[in-house]
């Protein structure tokens, strides 16, 4: 597996346990929803990290209709201590974190699809951010990966552009600057971009979904920071988010991918050499988008949970250790879950869940009990 910095928790690779019931967040009449935090209008992406180096997990959320990213600083008890926002370009649909200037603090970068730009904010070390630069030359950037592609100790950036149908790779200079060094085909209408290590060589690989061709493209990384030509794998219609783990127990990284057009989760088995084959399909709710994976029941096995936007519920798939999953009863949530993520927000050693709701313009935290049960975090009435 490619190693990431300790403070960075990427939402797409976290998960939710399945052993207990997940309660619906209660509406507080006259005050909105308890436990919800403002997340910008039509939030579209979230990243979790310790942004102010106080030992507590925080999160940054891209609000696609407000030209801003919202930073929620955690209090270590499952609540939010502060809420700040930062202006970016029009239509921010993705936000991620990486230490672009090498000072040990996670910086933030957003993909602004409407403006055709990428905005980099540098962290001042206290969880406040100063705008460093606006990268141009894009037409429709929709997803980002921040990682050290060439293993020079500096964070680089890959950008999926849905209108250019490419992945653009930028080399970081370790001071907050970036230069475009390569472009790779990504299929028609690339949508989600993620990092993993499918061939177990310790070098970052990239996987990108194509909404136009209903495929994923695997870009195997080389030690010099370049990538091989894409290996294209056909999946179901409209592939969205992915989760990576050894789901089959053979020591190789596999891929679970949600396909919204067929209300299906597709499991692709890896061979440890970068090749993927379709292993199984599992039904979900209607219009699934996010998926997260993790062992939240304490049985040593990774389960999957999918957020279904049109039915406002979660599909829970419990893994049996052979790559097969059993579907547990669906869980209703108050709105359309566009993004899921996880981290130990109340620092009890048990992973918690983050749900981002697009139409409510809010995010909520469910506190995990370590046995698969989750309880919504209740705070003061929202503003």
Roles of regions detected by a PLM:
Residues 55-57, 104-106, 153-155, 202-204, ...:
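Glycine-aliphatic tripeptides that mark coil-to-beta-strand junctions in extracellular
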Residues 44-53, 73, 93-102, 142-151, ...:
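Beta-propeller blade termini
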Residues 21-41, 73-90, 122-139, 171-188, ...:
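Blade-edge motifs of beta-propeller repeat domains
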Residues 68-71, 117-120, 166-169, 215-218, ...:
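A short loop-to-beta-strand structural motif that recurs across blades of beta-propeller domains
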Residues 59-62, 108-111, 157-160, 206-209, ...:
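Hydrophobic beta-strand segments that make up the repeating blades of beta-propeller
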Residues 9-20:
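Bacterial N-terminal signal peptides
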Residues 37-64:
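Beta-strand-rich domains and repeat architectures in extracellular enzymes and scaffolds
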């Amino acid at each position: 597996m490619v190693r990431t910095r300790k403070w960075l928790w990427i939402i797409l690779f976290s998960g939710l346990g399945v052993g207990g019931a997940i309660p619906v967040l209660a509406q507080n009449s006259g005050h909105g929803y308890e436990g919800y935090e403002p997340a910008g209008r039509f939030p579209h992406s979230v990243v979790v990290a310790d942004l102010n180096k106080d030992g507590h997990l925080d999160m940054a959320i891209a609000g696609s209709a407000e030209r801003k990213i919202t930073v929620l600083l955690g209090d270590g008890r499952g609540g939010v201590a502060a809420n700040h926002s930062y202006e970016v370009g029009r239509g921010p649909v993705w936000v991620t974190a990486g230490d672009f200037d090498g000072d040990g603090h996670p910086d933030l970068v957003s993909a602004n699809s409407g403006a055709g730009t990428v905005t980099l904010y540098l962290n001042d070390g206290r969880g406040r951010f100063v705008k460093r630069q606006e990268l141009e030359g894009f037409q429709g950037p929709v997803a980002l990966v921040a990682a050290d592609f060439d293993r020079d100790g500096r964070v680089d950036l890959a950008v999926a552009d849905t209108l250019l149908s490419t992945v653009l790779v930028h080399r970081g200079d370790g001071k907050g600057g970036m230069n475009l060094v390569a472009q790779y085909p990504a299929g028609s209408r690339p949508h989600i971009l993620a990092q993993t290590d499918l061939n177990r060589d310790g070098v970052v690989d990239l996987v990108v979904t194509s909404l136009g061709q209903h495929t994923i493209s695997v870009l195997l990384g080389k030690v010099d920071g370049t990538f091989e030509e894409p290996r294209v794998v056909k999946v179901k219609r409209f592939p969205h988010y992915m989760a990576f783990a050894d789901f089959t127990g053979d020591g190789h990284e596999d891929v679970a991918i949600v396909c919204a057009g067929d209300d299906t989760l597709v499991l692709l088995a890896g061979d440890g050499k970068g090749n993927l084959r379709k292993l199984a399909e599992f039904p979900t709710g209607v219009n699934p988008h996010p998926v997260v994976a993790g062992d939240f029941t304490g049985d040593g096995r990774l389960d999957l949970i999918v957020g279904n936007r049109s039915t406002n519920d979660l599909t829970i798939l419990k893994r049996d250790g052979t790559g097969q999953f059993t579907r547990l009863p669906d869980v209703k949530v108050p709105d359309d879950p566009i993004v899921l993520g996880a981290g130990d927000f109340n620092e009890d050693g048990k992973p918690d869940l983050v749900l981002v709701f697009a139409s409510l313009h809010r995010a909520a935290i469910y506190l995990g009990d370590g046995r698969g049960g989750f309880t919504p975090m209740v705070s003061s009435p929202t503003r």
